[in-house]
């Protein structure tokens, strides 16, 4: 008996996702498993070929968070062909300044941004603009240096 003839083919097919959003708490304690190379590898395998994963990376202004951000970025960058860190100001978060990760098998967050397609949607947002999108990926020099310290040459 093969699996298809018994109608069980779908059970054995791996689900694939367009987007994985990892909205975890701090990379310590119970959510520590969401910051491992194995977890990022599972996310990579679960994404479609043009899929994207985003995750929180903490604040660079606290030593423990900054070290965790570097570890996380190193693990993601070694797993995904495209890995970038972006920033946002969130007053209710510690230090009011937070970092996030963007990872993809295919798309670069700036080079592949289609601003005209976004404008064609004619959505009115109170926060997001394509200019803000691009600007979020331009990091201060101290952060660029922190990320370079852990990136492997490609």
Where on the chain are the PLM-derived regions?
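Single conserved hydrophobic/aromatic residue that forms the stacking wall/gate
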Residues: 1-12
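Conserved class I S-adenosyl-L-methionine
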Residues: 31, 58-69
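A short glycine-rich, Lys/Arg-flanked "PGG" loop and its adjoining helix->strand segment in the class I
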Residues: 37-49, 77
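Conserved beta-strand signature within the Rossmann-like core of class I S-adenosyl-L-methionine
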Residues: 50-57
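Conserved S-adenosyl-L-methionine
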Residues: 81-91
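SAM/dcSAM-binding transferase cores
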Residues: 95-154
């Amino acid at each position: 008996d093969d699996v298809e003839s018994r109608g069980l083919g779908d059970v054995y097919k791996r689900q694939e996702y367009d987007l994985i959003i990892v909205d975890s708490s701090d990379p310590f304690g119970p959510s520590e498993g969401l910051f491992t190379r194995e977890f990022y590898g599972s996310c990579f395998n679960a994404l479609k070929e043009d899929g994207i994963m985003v995750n929180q990376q903490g604040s660079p202004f606290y030593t423990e968070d900054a070290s965790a951000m570097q570890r996380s970025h190193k693990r993601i960058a070694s797993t995904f062909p495209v890995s970038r860190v972006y920033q946002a100001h969130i007053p209710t978060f510690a230090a009011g300044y937070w970092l996030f990760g963007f990872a993809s098998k295919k798309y670069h967050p700036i080079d592949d941004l289609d601003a005209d397609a976004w404008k064609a949607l004619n959505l009115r947002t109170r926060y997001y603009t394509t200019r803000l999108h691009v600007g979020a990926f331009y990091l201060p020099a101290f952060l660029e240096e922190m990320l370079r310290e852990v990136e492997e040459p490609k």
